[in-house]
Each structure stands twice: as structure tokens, then as C-alpha cells.
UniProtKB/Swiss-Prot annotation:
It comes from Sus scrofa. The modification Phosphothreonine is found at T12. Residues 7-21 have a biased composition (Basic and acidic residues). This is Small nuclear ribonucleoprotein Sm D2. Its main location: cytoplasm. PANTHER family: SMALL NUCLEAR RIBONUCLEOPROTEIN SM D2 (PTHR12777). The modification Phosphoserine is found at S9. One of its GO terms (biological process) is spliceosomal snRNP assembly. Core component of the spliceosomal U1, U2, U4 and U5 small nuclear ribonucleoproteins (snRNPs), the building blocks of the spliceosome. Most spliceosomal snRNPs contain a common set of Sm proteins, SNRPB, SNRPD1, SNRPD2, SNRPD3, SNRPE, SNRPF and SNRPG that assemble in a heptameric protein ring on the Sm site of the small nuclear RNA to form the core snRNP. Component of the U1 snRNP. The U1 snRNP is composed of the U1 snRNA and the 7 core Sm proteins SNRPB, SNRPD1, SNRPD2, SNRPD3, SNRPE, SNRPF and SNRPG, and at least three U1 snRNP-specific proteins SNRNP70/U1-70K, SNRPA/U1-A and SNRPC/U1-C. Residues 1-36 are annotated as: Disordered. There is a cross-link at K6, K8 (Glycyl lysine isopeptide (Lys-Gly) (interchain with G-Cter in SUMO2)). Coiled coil: none annotated. Belongs to the snRNP core protein family. It comes from the Eukaryota. The gene is SNRPD2.
Amino acid sequence: MSLLNKPKSEMTPEELQKREEEEFNTGPLSVXTQSXKTXTQVLINCRNTK
């Protein structure tokens, strides 16, 4: 079973750490993570879609 599909409550600490690393390297937060590492600016546009 993929770590992304497995519930966090059923993961070992090692699996949780690996999943977190994957999310920061490939998920939406990867843009913010990479910009912080390279000291570049990122424009974040937030909107309320009510």
C-alpha cells in the first residue's frame, strides 16, 4: 500500500517521516520549500471561494 493511501494512524514513525518528506518534495508545499532553500520570492494568492 502506498504511503499516500495509508492512514496516518496506522503508520510507524519512520513511515510518517518518509511521507512528510515526500509531501514537502512533491506536494503543494514544495514551491515554498524550494523558494526558502534558494532564497527566491514566491507570490501567494489566497482567495475566499464562498
